[in-house]
Regions:
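Conserved AMP-binding/adenylation subdomain of ANL enzymes
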Residues: 172-190, 200-240, 254
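Conserved ATP/PPi-binding loop(s) of AMP-dependent carboxylate-activating enzymes
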Residues: 320-324, 335-366, 403
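Conserved AMP-binding A3 loop
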Residues: 30-32, 149-176
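Gly/Ser/Thr-rich phosphate-binding loop
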Residues: 238-243, 252-313, 326
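Structural core segment of the AMP-binding/adenylate-forming
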Residues: 45-48, 71, 75-142, 443-445, ...
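AMP-binding/adenylate-forming catalytic core of the ANL superfamily
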Residues: 87, 349, 354-355, 377-464, ...
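Conserved AMP-binding/adenylate-forming core of the ANL superfamily
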Residues: 18-63, 67-71, 88-93, 169
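Conserved pre-ATP/AMP-binding loop-to-beta segment of ANL
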Residues: 2, 18-20, 135-153, 159-160, ...
C-alpha cells in the first residue's frame, strides 16, 4: 500500500507537539492543538456516517477548519472537493452534482447559499472557521477509490469547468519535488498561506508543503488589503510567500504607501500567470526580495517547473522541470523537437493526473499514450530552462484565473438583442488582463452595457464578467486595446 498524505502529516506533526504550527488572527496554534482540531473533525464525520471513498465539498476560505477537515477526511479514506465559494451559483451546483458529494460544508460568509444548495438535494452545513459544527446528515453518494485525495475544478485547456482528481501519490510527489528543487526549505521557514486553497497552486504551495513538512504557516482568509498582509508578514517573520502576479502587483502598489522591508523574507514564489519581467527588478529594489517563478497546471498537481533556488533565477524563464515530471516538445506531426525549437509541450510523471474525472471525451483528447497535452507552446534552452511562447487556446488571464473567451461569448450571445459578440483580454497592470466584449446588436434592438454585465454576473464567476463592453457596427478582425 502506498504512503498516504495523512500518515506523513500526522507523524510529522506529532513530533514536538508544542511547537508552533499555524497562526490565525494573531494567535499561534501548536502542532498538538491543530491535531486536536483534526481529531474533533474526524469524530464529527464518523458520527455523520461518512464512509471511505465518499467525497465532501469544502466551500471554505483558508482557515484552521479547512485544513483540519482536509486531513480528517483523508484519515477516513475520503476525498476532498474544494470549491470556489465566490463563484456563480449555477457553477457551484454543477460542480457539486458532478462530484456526487456526500455533503457540502461552508461558513457564515456564505450562509445565504447553504439553503439553495440543500434545495438541490445536496446537504450543506455551516461551520465556524476554528471548530467543527454538529454531525451532518449526508446523502447516499457514490463511493469510489480512496486513492483520490482531492478533486479540483479547473478551466484547464477548455473553457468549460472540469474535474481533475489528484491521488495521494500525485500530491506527495509534487510536494517533495518542490522542496527538493528549491533546496533551502527548512523547519526554520514560515510560509504565508494566502493563495485560495480551492486552487491547486494555493493548496500545494500554501498548505500542503506546510502540512507535509510540519512547517509553520500564517493562514489568511484574504490577501487584501495588501498593506495589512505585508505587516502580518513582518510581525510573524514569514520567510516564503507563494503568490500569483496580481498579489505581487498589489504588494508593489502598497509599497507606495510606505512599506518597510522585512529581513525575514527570503523570496516570493510566483505562479498561476505570466510574470512581467520588470516585477523581478522592482520586487528586489522595493521589497528587497527576489521572485522565484514557475509554471504548472492543475493536471500536474499545480507545478511543472521552478527556478532551482535563488541562484537559479533567469528573468523571462520559468525554471527547470521538477524531478517528478518528464516533458517533450513536439511539432504538429508529433515529432520531438530539440532544445531551442518551439512546439507543443507534453508532460508525464508521478505528479500528473491520469485522466479527467468522469469525462472520458476530454480524457481521450488530452491524455494520449501516457502523456498530457498542455496545449501550451513552449521551448527549452540548452540548460533546460522553460519558456512559454503562447497558447493553443484562446485564454484571458485575470488575476491568475483562466477565462476562456468562448465561454463568455456564449453567455452574451444567448441574449435575443445580440447578433454577434467577440471577447478579448485587455492588459491591466494589476490583474494582468480584464475581459472586454465587442457586441453587434440586432437591427432595432437595444440593451445597455450595464444590463449585459448584470446578466453575466448571474451566469459567470466574478472574474469572467466583462469589465468593458463596446457596441460596434462590425466585429474587429484583430485585437483592439
Amino acid at each position: 500500500m502506498s504512503i498516504r498524505l495523512e500518515q506523513i502529516i500526522s507523524e510529522n506533526l506529532e513530533r514536538l507537539p508544542n511547537e508552533p504550527f499555524l497562526c490565525w488572527q494573531k494567535t499561534w496554534w501548536s502542532r498538538g492543538a491543530f491535531l486536536e482540531l483534526v481529531k474533533e473533525c474526524e469524530e464529527r464525520l464518523v458520527e455523520s456516517r461518512f464512509k471511505p471513498g465518499q467525497k465532501i465539498a469544502l466551500l471554505l476560505p483558508n482557515s484552521p477548519i479547512s485544513l483540519a477537515l482536509t486531513v480528517a477526511i483523508w484519515k477516513l479514506q475520503g476525498t476532498v472537493v474544494p470549491i470556489d465559494y465566490r463563484g456563480a451559483y449555477i457553477t457551484l451546483i454543477k460542480q457539486l452534482v458532478h462530484a456526487d458529494v456526500f455533503a457540502a460544508i461552508t461558513f457564515m460568509g456564505c450562509e445565504n447559499i447553504a439553503p439553495l444548495i440543500s434545495e438541490e438535494g445536496i446537504p450543506c452545513y455551516i461551520t465556524s472557521l476554528v471548530a467543527p459544527g454538529d454531525p451532518i446528515a449526508g446523502r447516499a453518494a457514490l463511493k469510489e477509490t480512496a486513492d483520490n485525495a482531492v478533486i479540483f475544478y479547473t478551466s484547464g485547456t477548455t473553457g468549460e469547468s472540469k474535474a481533475v482528481a489528484l491521488s495521494h501519490s500525485n500530491l506527495l510527489s509534487v510536494t517533495e519535488s518542490c522542496i527538493e528543487h528549491l533546496g533551502d526549505i527548512s523547519e526554520d521557514d514560515i510560509l504565508l498561506n494566502a493563495l485560495p486553497n480551492f486552487n491547486a497552486l494555493g493548496f500545494v504551495s500554501g498548505s500542503l508543503i506546510s502540512l507535509v513538512k510540519a512547517l509553520p504557516q500564517v493562514t489568511l482568509q484574504s490577501f487584501m488589503p495588501a498593506k495589512t498582509t505585508w505587516n502580518i508578514v513582518k510581525q510573524n517573520n514569514v520567510t516564503i510567500i507563494p503568490a500569483v502576479p496580481t498579489m505581487i502587483a498589489l504588494l508593489l502598489g502598497a509599497a507606495g504607501q510606505g512599506l518597510d522591508r522585512t529581513s525575514s523574507l527570503k523570496y516570493i514564489l510566483s505562479g498561476g500567470d505570466k510574470l512581467p519581467e520588470n516585477y523581478i527588478k522592482r520586487c528586489t529594489e522595493i521589497l528587497g526580495v527576489p521572485i522565484i517563478e514557475g509554471y504548472g497546471l492543475t493536471e500536474a498537481s499545480s507545478v511543472v517547473s521552478l527556478a532551482p533556488g535563488i541562484d537559479g533565477i533567469k528573468p523571462g524563464k520559468l525554471g527547470t522541470l521538477l524531478s517528478c515530471v518528464e516533458s517533450k516538445i513536439c511539432d504538429d506531426t508529433g515529432a520531438v523537437l530539440p532544445p531551442g525549437k518551439e512546439g507543443k509541450l507534453w508532460i508525464r510523471g508521478e505528479s500528473v493526473a491520469s485522466s479527467y474525472y468522469r469525462n472520458s471525451e476530454l480524457t481521450e483528447r488530452y491524455f494520449v499514450d501516457g502523456w498530457f497535452d498542455t496545449s501550451d507552446i513552449a521551448k527549452f534552452d540548452e540548460e533546460g530552462f522553460l519558456s512559454l511562447v503562447g497558447r493553443t487556446t484562446d485564454v484571458i488571464f485575470v488575476g491568475g484565473f483562466k477565462v476562456y473567451a468562448g465561454e463568455v461569448e456564449m453567455v452574451i450571445s444567448e441574449h435575443p438583442a445580440v447578433a454577434e459578440v467577440s471577447v478579448i483580454g485587455v492588459p491591466r497592470s494589476i490583474s494582468g488582463e480584464i475581459v472586454k466584449a465587442f457586441i453587434v446588436l440586432k437591427e432595432g434592438e437595444k440593451i445597455t452595457s450595464k444590463e449585459l454585465i448584470e446578466i453575466c454576473k448571474k451566469k459567470l464567476s466574478y472574474y469572467k464578467v466583462p469589465r468593458i463592453i463596446e457596441f460596434v457596427e462590425k466585429l474587429p478582425t484583430r485585437k483592439i486595446w
